[in-house]
Swiss-Prot record:
This is Ribosomal RNA small subunit methyltransferase A. PANTHER family: DIMETHYLADENOSINE TRANSFERASE, DIMETHYLADENOSINE TRANSFERASE-RELATED. HAMAP family: 16SrRNA_methyltr_A. It is found in: Cytoplasm. It holds the Pfam family RrnaAD. Its main location: cytoplasm.
């Protein structure tokens, strides 16, 4: 029988390292709550990034997935994870940098991603996975609360930006719940939150999404500027294109809907 999450970490002398962006969760009930929010079903193929001391890993395994693949770059955690594997042979441990992983490398059916992501790479991973959304069943992720609010933000709000636009064009997004700093060791300086993203059945092709990325980068770089000024270097006839879409030249980036950006991308 495995010891508690905290005792298991202590037995391996694993302490959080800042260079890995580590904030460990020792509360098994919180880990269970995250897995419940994911709606994980038995016999699913699951991916977890940064399992660390294995708290969330254990909760996922209790749902009896077909296969749980964990990606861990901290070699100190590998022996601990191997001890969990002794009780759960459906655990696949890969020592690798998550930023070098392609979902297609896993050679599995639709992947359910459940992770407490390192905050310094969280946004980048979300965007990468959205671009491979045909391989994803859903993503239930712990991120900084501020990032989750940006993912879920609606037009004409302060948090609305590039991330909001791209996420809403590719997936349905749902904020599940907040997590206080005290839930972690060591406590981070900010609140966290759980968000679930489920890819849409019909999504724009990759070329259009790339154009949306370019347009939103330009638009939100001049967030307080009128959209015709922000996008003046996008196309010489930008005012005509905006008029064609019934978008006022006097709008700002935050006033355009995700579909407005998609329509504009289709004209570029």
């Amino acid at each position: 029988m495995l010891p508690s999450i905290a005792k298991h970490a202590a037995s391996h002398q694993i302490h959080p390292l800042k260079k890995h962006g580590q904030n460990f969760i020792f509360d098994g009930s919180l880990c269970d709550k995250i897995v419940r929010a994911s709606g994980l079903e038995e016999n699913s193929n699951v991916l977890e990034i940064g399992p660390g001391t294995g708290g969330l890993t254990r909760s996922i395994l209790h749902k009896n997935p077909k296969l749980l693949t964990v990606i861990e770059t901290d070699e100190r955690c590998i022996p601990l994870l191997n001890e969990i594997k002794q009780y759960h042979p459906n655990l696949n441990i890969i020592k690798q940098d998550a930023l070098k992983l392609k979902l297609s490398d896993l050679n599995t059916n639709k992947i359910t991603i459940i992770s407490n992501l390192p905050y310094h790479i969280g946004t980048e991973l979300v965007i990468r996975w959205l671009k491979e959304s045909s391989l994803v069943a859903s993503m239930t992720l712990m991120l900084q609360k501020e990032v989750v609010e940006r993912i879920c933000a609606k037009p004409s709000t302060k948090a609305y930006g590039r991330l909001s636009v791209i996420c809403s064009l590719i997936a349905t997004v749902e904020k599940c719940f907040d997590v206080a700093p005290t839930a972690f060791y060591p406590p981070p300086k900010v609140y966290s939150a759980i968000v679930k993203l489920t890819p849409l059945e019909n999504i724009p092709n990759s070329d259009l999404i790339s154009k949306v990325e370019l347009i939103t980068k330009m638009a939100f770089a001049g967030r307080r500027k009128m959209i015709k000024s922000s996008l003046k270097n996008l196309a010489p006839n930008i005012s005509e294109l905006l008029a064609k879409l019934n978008i006022s030249n006097n709008c700002r980036a935050e006033n355009l809907t995700p579909n407005d950006y998609l329509s504009l991308a289709s004209l570029i």
